[in-house]
Amino acid sequence: MKTSVVFVIAGLALLSVVCYASELKEQSSVNEVLSTIFHFEQPEERGCLEFWWKCNPNDDKCCRPKLKCSKLFKLCNFSFGK
C-alpha cells in the first residue's frame, strides 16, 4: 500500500514536470512567432531623408525640394513658406 502511494506521488510529480517543460517550450515558440510577425526593420541610415521620415531639426537632411524637418513632429514634411 505504501509503495503504491509513493509511485502515484512520483508519477504525479513527473507528470507536472513534463507538463511544465512542454508549456515553457510552447510559450517560447509562441513568443518566436509573435516576434516574427511584429518585427519591424529599422530604416537604414542614409544621407538623404524622404517624406515622413524621422529627422533632426538641427541637421536637416530632407531631400526633395520643399521638404523641411518639422520642429514639432521631427519628421520630413512639406514646407509651403519661404
Curated annotation (Swiss-Prot):
GO molecular function: ion channel inhibitor activity; lipid binding; potassium channel regulator activity; sodium channel regulator activity; toxin activity
One GO cellular component term noted in the UniProt record for this chain: extracellular region
Disulfide bridge map: 48-63, 55-69, 62-76
Propeptide feature ranges: 22-46
GO BP field: defense response to bacterium
Residues in the signal sequence: 1-21
Upper taxonomic lineage: Eukaryota, Metazoa, Ecdysozoa, Arthropoda, Chelicerata
Pfam families for this protein: Toxin_12
Primary location class: secreted
Name this polypeptide is given: M-theraphotoxin-Gr1a
Subcellular location: Secreted
Phenylalanine amide PTM positions: 80
Additional free-text comment from the UniProt record: Negative results: this toxin does not inhibit potassium channels Kv1.1/KCNA1, Kv1.4/KCNA4 and Kv11.3/KCNH7 (IC(50)=53->85 uM).
Tissue: Expressed by the venom gland.
Similarity comment: family membership: Belongs to the neurotoxin 10 (Hwtx-1) family. 52 (MTx4) subfamily.
Keywords per UniProt: Amidation, Antibiotic, Antimicrobial, Disulfide bond, Ion channel impairing toxin, Knottin, Lipid-binding, Neurotoxin, Potassium channel impairing toxin, Secreted, Signal, Toxin, Voltage-gated potassium channel impairing toxin, Voltage-gated sodium channel impairing toxin
Domain notes: The presence of a 'disulfide through disulfide knot' structurally defines this protein as a knottin.
General function of this protein: This cationic hydrophobic peptide acts on a lot of different channels and has an antimicrobial activity. It blocks mechanosensitive ion channels (also named stretch-activated channels or SACs), without having effect on whole-cell voltage-sensitive currents. It also affects acetylcholine receptors (nAChRs) through interactions with membrane lipids by prolonging the closing time without affecting channel conductance or opening activity. It shows high affinity for lipid bilayers.
